[in-house]
């Protein structure tokens, strides 16, 4: 698959609500180019990941008993700039329904407002682009299904920084991302379900001027009545309406499952095929314990909450497997009605009783 051209980010009408060129330019500045990598190192990384992605698919399918339809998983080793451009296009696709409503209400959106939103998007994308190792993009067009992104500079930087054996680390990353490919391959309805949640949430956002003020006033009143009800949930929930909180809960439960399952499979498969696994896990824990400005930014984007959410998902998967084996767990991919609720993620026995018993 050829890299997206630089002007691809301007191909969608959603460009009228944000300056996407500003987003891309700022993201590249924030991300930086990454470490210096020789042509030989780049070629070896591509060769390794092409081979290891195919190997990972065999390992994941053999371990889980799940067989993904469609094309096999394919590797695209890219730089930070390519990753930023691809994800900017994805964000535009997701924001299109909201963009239409905003432009209907206020077609003359100012250049300052567009640049401000572009700068916000760019700062977040740039930060993530410095850290992301691999990604299975669930919102790719159908003809790109199976494509897995690997951010080459980040992978090489991580290997060097922590003294890891390259092929072991590359296989470890591939196993995680290929697991996501298998999830969406064995359950084609997942892509539409996730997209539906995004559309449902964006459709619920009020574009009336006083709506946010009213929600904030209601949230403050609710917090004063019961402060403990919001502990650990994140301040963002204070500004959500009851229907939005329900959408948020379903999305959170689904992401807990997807990431928890990927972590479980990655760790179990890697335990028998990645000799350097213990050192990789220590390196990952060390990176997550970062301090200073980076930690403050992680808090601002609720990174710690996401890590805790995914850990809860892995606990859910492990308990279901312990109770009923892989066959019980694999029922979760049959239909959206079999997805765990947020409460069931916290108490897996409830899901087993409802679905997997």
Residue map of PLM features:
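N-terminal low-structure segments adjacent to metalloprotease catalytic domains
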Residues: 1-93, 311, 323-357
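Acidic, low-complexity proline/glycine-rich segments
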Residues: 8-25, 136-150, 224-230
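Hydrophobic (often cysteine-bearing) scaffold residues that line and stabilize catalytic clefts
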Residues: 52, 121, 166, 171, ...
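Auxiliary, metal-adjacent structural segments of Zn-dependent hydrolase domains
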Residues: 52-153
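Post-HExxH zinc-binding segment in Zn-dependent metallohydrolases
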Residues: 118, 125-133, 185-238, 242, ...
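Short pre-active-site segment immediately N-terminal to the catalytic Zn-binding motif
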Residues: 154-173
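Active-site recognition of the HExxH zinc-binding catalytic motif
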Residues: 169-185, 317
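Pan-zinc metallopeptidase signature
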Residues: 238-357
């Amino acid at each position: 698959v050829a890299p997206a051209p630089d002007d691809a980010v301007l191909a969608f009408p959603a460009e009228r609500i944000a300056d996407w060129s500003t987003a891309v330019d700022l993201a590249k500045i924030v991300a930086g180019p990454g470490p210096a990598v020789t042509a030989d190192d780049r070629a070896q990384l591509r060769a390794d990941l092409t081979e290891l992605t195919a190997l990972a698919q065999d390992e994941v399918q053999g371990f889980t008993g799940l067989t993904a339809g469609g094309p096999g998983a394919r590797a695209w080793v890219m730089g930070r700039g390519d990753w930023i451009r691809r994800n900017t296009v994805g964000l535009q696709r997701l924001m299109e329904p909201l963009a239409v409503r905003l432009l209907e209400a206020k077609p003359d959106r100012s250049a300052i407002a567009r640049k401000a939103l572009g700068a916000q998007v760019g700062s977040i994308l740039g930060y993530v682009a410095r850290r992301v190792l691999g990604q299975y993009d669930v919102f790719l067009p159908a003809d790109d299904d199976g494509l897995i992104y690997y951010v080459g500079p980040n992978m090489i930087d991580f290997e060097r920084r922590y003294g890891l054996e390259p092929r072991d680390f590359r296989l470890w990353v591939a196993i995680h991302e290929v697991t996501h490919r298998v999830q969406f391959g064995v359950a084609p309805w997942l892509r539409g379900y996730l997209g539906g949640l995004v559309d449902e949430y964006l459709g619920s956002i009020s574009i009336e001027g006083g709506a946010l003020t009213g929600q904030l006033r209601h949230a403050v009143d609710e917090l004063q009545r019961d402060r403990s009800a919001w502990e650990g949930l994140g301040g963002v929930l204070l500004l959500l309406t009851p229907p939005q909180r329900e959408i948020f809960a379903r999305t959170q439960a689904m992401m807990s499952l997807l990431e928890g399952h990927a972590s479980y499979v990655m760790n179990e498969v890697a335990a028998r095929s990645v000799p350097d696994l213990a050192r990789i896990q220590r390196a990952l824990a060390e990176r997550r314990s970062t301090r200073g400005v980076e930690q403050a930014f992680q808090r601002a984007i609720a990174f710690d909450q996401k890590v805790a959410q995914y850990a809860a998902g892995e606990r859910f998967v492990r308990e279901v497997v312990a109770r009923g084996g892989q066959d019980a767990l694999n029922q979760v991919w049959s239909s959206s009605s079999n997805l765990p609720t947020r409460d069931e993620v916290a108490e897996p026995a409830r899901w087993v009783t409802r679905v997997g018993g």
